[in-house]
Amino acid sequence: MGISWFLSRFRIRTVAPSSFLKPRGLVYRPSQIRRRVSLLSLSGFHPYRAYSILGPKTPTAFNSANTVRFFSFSSISRLVFRSLRLPVAGFSLVAGGAAYIGAQVQRASDYTKDIFDKTFGILDSTWEKTRETVASVTNVQLPEISMPLWLEKILRLDEESAERRRVLQAERAKEHRSNSNDKQKSSDNDEDPNDTTVGIGAALAASILSVDSVDGEDTLTADEKRKLAQESKEDRMMLFTKKMIEIRNILQDIQDNNSAVTLPSIVVIGSQSSGKSSVLEAIVGHEFLPKGSNMVTRRPIELTLVHSADTAIPYGEFSGVQLGKITDFSKIQHILTDLNMAVPSSQGVDDNPIRLTIYASHIPNLSLIDLPGYIQIHSEDQPADLDMKISKLCEKYIREPNIILAVCAADVDLANSAALRASRRVDPLGLRTIGVVTKMDLVPPSKAISILHNNNYPLHYGYIGVISRIVPTGRFSAGQNLTDLVSTQENSYFSTHQQFADARIGNYLGIQSLRKCLINVLEYTMSKNLQHTADSIRTELEECNYQYKVQYNDRVLTADSYIAEGLDIFKAAFKEFTQKFGKSEVRDLLKSSLNEKVMDLLAERYWTDDDISNWSKHTNALDEHWKYKLDSCVSTLTRMGLGRVSTLLVTDSISKCIDEITKASPFADHPAAMQYIMNAAQDILRRRFHATSEQVENCVKPYKYDVEVNDDEWKSSRGQAEKLLQRELGLCQSALEKIKNAVGSRRMNQVLQYLEEQKTSSEPLPASYSTALLEQGRMLQYLKMREDILKLRISVLKSRACKHKEAKYTCPEIFLNAVSDKLVNTAVLFINIELLSEFYYQFPRELDQRLIHSLSSEQLNAFVNENPRLKSQLQLQHKRQCLELALQKINSLVILEQQADSD
């Protein structure tokens, strides 16, 4: 705009001479022209020079004037400058446009990266919450999601580059604002158009150079570079420690005592009342450890601290205890106390650890193990060797590669510290030991400083002095962070004593220094053992794969698949049972039961009658006595409650068959599964029992009043009655032979003769035989009488007197058998519909519901563990899966460490 304005002004001034020299067509003399031109020259304007450059306004402007062109060497520089002014301005505009386009492209790229980063962060957090919810409800582990590697490389979404981009963007914005201010000042101060044009080009060139320089790291100062490197290192350390703790938790799930893979942890040891619990609680920021006058820490507490920036409310979770997320740390303290006090005082300590994981945004990623404190004297209710048990338990945990955190009280001589003596036995050089001196405010500052100087009992990581006394609960609310309160108290104490102002011991004072030291030492130890741990996991995995291939032929098995396979086998056997147990089998079952009932009625009401022999011989005689006997037998048979009797008989038979099928199935090794199956069968049978028995009773109700038998039924029943009597006769003869063989025929004859004499004698005979022998003789007499009656009745049934149905009173055996047939046939029809069909349909589905859909993961694991062979297979398979996952994670960490070292 400034150039256009200048050119327009220049054109107007070039037109002025011609209009001045020749207004309204008049012609001036040369003297007049020279006089007017000289006046214009004094004002700084040269009309002839302008005319010579741009030409006259009109072709006849100077036709009548004798003009003289003035030329000097000073006009050469101005001519060159004016000829280069337009190209320079165009180049400046092009450069400025290119710089503007580049800046807009960079802004679009950064905006796209931020959008991708935020979007993936939201998706990642949402999916993580979904995984936790599904895992807590169904115990199903959903897969993790991660951004593809190629997209990470494109977007540069790793931790270090993201931080570097944020710093560079801030520097770019700052310089852009400063450049804008400088350019605005220069445009306001410059009046000359030439200087304005040059200033625009210089500003555009400077903006191009500034954009190029901002993209590199050369614009950062040395302090900013160190700060950026330190922040990147801390982020990398935090990420590395968190991943290693995840690997440690994975390896802990293996539960194999023979595993040689161990990851470093910080083991806290010290004497009772040395302040171990206070130090741990100050690190965590909450009171959660058990406290008491007696020894309350009786089991190792494996404490895992997880830094979770998204966690607004800290919470804890116990491994192996289904308590969920616990946000009340007093409840955590109560649970820890109960778990520790579950160990009886007579036992002292138990090496079964308590695993607790705490998630919070203000805690570092650490793996700590709190052990029972060393004691000097045991109480009466404690074992005499309690001190030895505690020492052995501590030595088990303070072995390599664990880090030893030896807690000592400042008011106790270090020479008497049990923690330092124990650490010297396994770490003579003190390379893995960190000394923590508690109660620094109870000793003079000079003595405290002498301890921290690390001269008498040197340790590689030195001693860190803390106070860490728990502030009384009444002075702060439960929501306050204990770490901040302890740090404030420590800073107040150390700042009031000038002896602690020495810069050499400044990094060895306070709980914050201890936290930093623990983070650095744990990260260094884990990093140092990273390759060794990866090799150990790889070796363990190879051995596990070999054992799994040899023992189980690489056959993958899960609790769900095992139960499904077992159910398939059971259902196949059950289907075979349904084909073998139908109406005909139920009919035979009921018929057999009613036959026994008929035999009992005949034996009770006919065969014990003294007149049975005469009645059998005179079959044509009809006597009301015998008619009443038959009617009473029929009434008893029809009113016996056939519905319940038959239904109960069938349900018992089904239950027995189901029990036999279960014992022959893969569930025979699982008592709980057998109980599930039997309960399912009994529940269905119980639900159908009432309806079935009612239907059967209603259908046999007409037979309670009248029973009609046709000729075919009589004929069929006659043959069946003969068979029943023949079977009964065979049983009777078998019993006779058994008694004779047991006693002897000769002696039995003597006993029978003695019984006959005793029966006919008016006076009691001397006891020549034992009571048991006499009982055998009386049984033999009864069986002989029964044998004679059965033979007599069989002969009657075979005679012509029992040929027709009108002889039902003469041949009650045939008629009662016909009645039982009618009852059985009627009952079978409704039992088949109401009981068998429903049971065969519902039972397999009930098994699926109870054994597949209703069991939790814990119940499935408990169910599978009942089979020793299956338990060992699943444990080996779980170990292989955990090792594969751990190896995958640790290999990625190895690659990241190598890249970090190369950078």
Swiss-Prot record:
Post-translational modification (record): Cleavage of the transit peptide by mitochondrial processing protease (MPP) produces a long integral membrane form of msp1 (l-msp1). Further processing by a rhomboid protease after the transmembrane regions produces a short peripheral membrane form of msp1 (s-msp1). Both isoforms are required for full activity.
Disulfide bonds: C802-C811
EC class: hydrolase
Disordered: annotated segments: 167-198
Protein name, UniProt field: Dynamin-like GTPase msp1, mitochondrial
Cited PANTHER family: DYNAMIN (PTHR11566:SF212)
Catalyzed reactions per annotation: GTP + H2O = GDP + phosphate + H(+)
Region entry G4 motif, spans: 438-441
Family the entry assigns: Belongs to the TRAFAC class dynamin-like GTPase superfamily. Dynamin/Fzo/YdjA family.
Enzyme Commission designation: 3.6.5.5
Keywords: Disulfide bond, GTP-binding, Hydrolase, Magnesium, Membrane, Metal-binding, Mitochondrion, Mitochondrion inner membrane, Nucleotide-binding, Signal-anchor, Transit peptide, Transmembrane, Transmembrane helix
Residues covered by the GED domain: 805-898
Annotated transmembrane regions: 86-103, 198-214
Annotated region (Paddle region), positions in chain: 691-805
UniProt xrefs under InterPro entries: Dynamin (IPR022812), Dynamin_GTPase (IPR001401), Dynamin_GTPase_CS (IPR019762), Dynamin_N (IPR045063), Dynamin_stalk (IPR000375), G_DYNAMIN_dom (IPR030381), GED_dom (IPR020850), LIS_MGM1 (IPR056495)
Region of interest (G3 motif), residue spans: 370-373
UniProt entry tagged with the keyword rRNA processing: no
Chain positions recorded as Mg(2+) binding sites: S277, T297, D370
Transit peptide, residue positions per record: 1-78
Protein's GO biological process: mitochondrial fusion; mitochondrial inner membrane fusion; mitochondrion organization; receptor internalization
